[in-house]
């Protein structure tokens, strides 16, 4: 009988740019403090109902159709001439959705999970979703590295 809402940085850059680093740091600190309070409330078996903000509720309504459209969403992905063919995009994709052929061309297999790890972890920012993301900064959690992403996949 409890629910809470914790604001974290948004990394879905087709919709909006991630917050600036100082704002991200504040979000992480606020989240850490709130998580401690949540843990205390859970330990004390306190009931708590905290609703989402309006934008969160609206996103919830769109979530079902969005999830259904994800596998083929990679059709809009592009790779610029900045690509060095390093293969990081392949290694961080949890769905094994990207092939990098010997001649250097990327192929998406239309089983995308929408995490955008390929886009965010590309060191050259060469992967984009159409023109929408070309000028938007990338986001990586400050404590997450390529090696962490590979480890989660079991690579």
Question: Where are each of the predicted segments found?
Answer:
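Short secondary-structure transition/capping segments
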Residues: 13-16, 22-30, 48-58, 89-100, 114, 142-143, 146-155
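Conserved short-loop catalytic and cofactor-binding motifs
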Residues: 23, 80-81, 110, 141-142
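A mid-sequence, solvent-exposed acidic-amphipathic segment
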Residues: 54-87, 91-94
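Long, positively charged, glycine-interspersed low-complexity recognition regions
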Residues: 125-155
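Conserved active-site and cofactor/substrate-binding residues in soluble primary-metabolism enzymes
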Residues: 30-33, 84, 113
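Iron-sulfur cluster-binding cysteine motifs and their immediate structural context
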Residues: 79, 88-107, 113, 117-134
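FMN-binding flavodoxin-like domain, especially the glycine-rich phosphate-binding loop
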Residues: 1-66
